[in-house]
Amino acid sequence: MIIWLSNFLEQYFPFFRLFEYLSFRAILSIITALTISLWMGPKLIAWLQNLQIGQVVRDDGPESHFSKRGTPTMGGIMILTAITVTVFLWADLTNPYVWAVMFVLLGYGAVGFVDDYRKVVRKNTDGLIARWKYFWQSSIALVVAFALYAYGKDTAATQLVVPFFKEVMPQLGLAYILLTYFVIVGTSNAVNLTDGLDGLAIMPTVFVAAGFAFIAWATGNVQFANYLHIPHIPLASELVVVCAAIVGAGFGFLWFNTYPAQVFMGDVGSLALGGALGTIAVLVRQEFLLVIMGGVFVVETLSVILQVGSYKLRGQRIFRMAPIHHHYELKGWPEPRVIVRFWIISMLLVLIALATLKVR
């Protein structure tokens, strides 16, 4: 929104030309989202406490988690508010890619809100019935997938980028819709599964968003896109502002979510952030890099799949408890140790993924 105003004012006040620079708006995006989160946090936490909207803890979970009962949840409202306000302030709202990410972010946020609300009101861990959650996740993802395919059909926006091979970028055709669907839904649920310890999900989300900010900038810059042998998609550059908003909001939320947490993001936050990251990965054509950058999310999800599969097929569990962060807790690792080590792994994976852009 500000960029529209600056286009008008710059003819009278040259200073406003600064707002045309993507880097300047990205910095302002981080600062704005961070400020909103820090300002909103205490108010939201107090409001949630007054409404007795507290975390419901599974009886079969680690004993160390029983003390978390009653801690305010649905803190993702803070994250989504900060991102939404920031994007509407600093992003170019004529860019359809911005709207695609925001549609998924807010749509999945609404699904997560209903899920959290039902958990809190009914005081159990069931929440929204699984088939309805999956239905709404699928519906939102398919709407975006079909819209993006119709908009970018047979262009660089629908090519498959294969790591390590600079000339291998086949057109996906209708398979683009299927890939987009699985990436968005899968990433959303993966982040949701990871959100089980204080600050565990938010920092990997921040790292991945920061990585995608660089990729979005490179993808939108014709010189760098050619240099790195990745598709040049001009619209992708504006996603830098969106990624910056996620980074700023994430740091602001971490201020209150760090161990011991004052608030949890809940499904309203984790489903939305995961869906947004998946959408960004699709838009910049780096689905494979998402698997590397989001390796923590991938491993958490695989641990659940392997645990369930092993128990049903062999009657035996592979891990003491899934997702895998609970396995390490039950092995005796203090919660902060699990969290920080997962953060370190996540940061390294993002750096490795970025390095692969040059290894072609």
From Swiss-Prot:
The chain crosses the membrane at residues 27-47, 73-93, 94-114, 132-152, 168-188, 199-219, 236-256, 263-283, 288-308, 338-358. Its EC number is 2.7.8.13. It is found in: Cell inner membrane. It is a multi-pass membrane protein. The keyword Lipid biosynthesis does not apply. Pfam families: Glycos_transf_4 (PF00953), MraY_sig1 (PF10555). Keywords: Cell cycle, Cell division, Cell inner membrane, Cell membrane, Cell shape, Cell wall biogenesis/degradation, Magnesium, Membrane, Metal-binding, Peptidoglycan synthesis, Transferase, Transmembrane, Transmembrane helix. GO terms for molecular function: metal ion binding; phospho-N-acetylmuramoyl-pentapeptide-transferase activity; UDP-N-acetylmuramoyl-L-alanyl-D-glutamyl-meso-2,6-diaminopimelyl-D-alanyl-D-alanine:undecaprenyl-phosphate transferase activity. Its cofactor is Mg(2+). One of its GO terms (cellular component) is plasma membrane. One of its GO terms (biological process) is cell division. Pathway: Cell wall biogenesis; peptidoglycan biosynthesis. It catalyses: UDP-N-acetyl-alpha-D-muramoyl-L-alanyl-gamma-D-glutamyl-meso-2,6-diaminopimeloyl-D-alanyl-D-alanine + di-trans,octa-cis-undecaprenyl phosphate = di-trans,octa-cis-undecaprenyl diphospho-N-acetyl-alpha-D-muramoyl-L-alanyl-D-glutamyl-meso-2,6-diaminopimeloyl-D-alanyl-D-alanine + UMP. It comes from the Bacteria. NCBIfam families: mraY. Belongs to the glycosyltransferase 4 family. MraY subfamily. Catalyzes the initial step of the lipid cycle reactions in the biosynthesis of the cell wall peptidoglycan: transfers peptidoglycan precursor phospho-MurNAc-pentapeptide from UDP-MurNAc-pentapeptide onto the lipid carrier undecaprenyl phosphate, yielding undecaprenyl-pyrophosphoryl-MurNAc-pentapeptide, known as lipid I. This is Phospho-N-acetylmuramoyl-pentapeptide-transferase. It comes from Aliivibrio fischeri (strain ATCC 700601 / ES114) (Vibrio fischeri). The gene is mraY.
